[in-house]
């Protein structure tokens, strides 16, 4: 895509990444790198406090806010982060801890820009679909076949047998776009024929 000559990092897209528990800093770093490599102008990472030093050593151009496991969420900072973003990615390496779930619920309830849900966000949603209730954002689910099977409460074999059908069922069930990742990627949107 051609960029406008008058553009700058602020006009090329600002993406908020909610990723990385204390044990999964690499997920936050890799996701933020992918955001920048895809052409976004700015990335801000919301990650667990223990990831501060590794994140800034690996990706000094990233901005960041931090949360601490088993402590109250920094809600004011999160609201500012969500208002700043043009898109939000949630889930890589987030974990399924109580605090991670609270972070995901808060994000879903307060996001109005496109919301990409991946990895542990999908695992949390598979356990409690009510997480998405009241979501006003356009949702994009990006499950691999195992995550898709969990979202649909079925088997991996069933999802592999019906690639388009399983993606379509997830899109309908969660009122979202579903990008099923496997050897062949299948995309399905709610309300559209597969």
Regions found by a protein language model. Give the residues of each.
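Small-residue (G/A/S/T)-rich helix-start motifs and N-terminal tracts that mark the onset
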Residues: 1-116, 123-140, 145-194
